[in-house]
């Protein structure tokens, strides 16, 4: 198995679903791995968990959206799956 390609595929999937509520199981299923093995491989190759990656990317995108100044904080929070602004 090409682990780098598998993790890149998972990252592409996560990037495409930043505004969706996705789970570790969803991502693992996409790359045909168990949740345990996916999280372990992702953590080894990226030095962060999939949840940390999603949280950082969502926060980064939310910040960029807010910097544009055209969206309300509550709208951006809900867009990126935050429960409250």
Predicted regions, residues:
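Key DNA-contact positions within bacterial/archaeal DNA-binding proteins
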Residues: 36, 85
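Terminal helix-turn-helix DNA-binding modules in bacterial transcription factors
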Residues: 8-25, 44-80
């Amino acid at each position: 198995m090409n682990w780098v390609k598998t993790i890149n595929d998972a990252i592409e999937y996560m990037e495409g679903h930043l505004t969706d509520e996705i789970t570790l199981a969803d991502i693992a299923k996409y790359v045909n791995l168990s949740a345990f093995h996916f999280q372990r491989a992702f953590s080894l190759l990226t030095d962060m968990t999939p949840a940390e990656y999603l949280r950082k990317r969502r926060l980064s995108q939310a910040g960029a959206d807010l910097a544009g100044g055209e969206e309300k904080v509550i709208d951006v929070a809900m867009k990126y799956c935050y429960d409250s602004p």
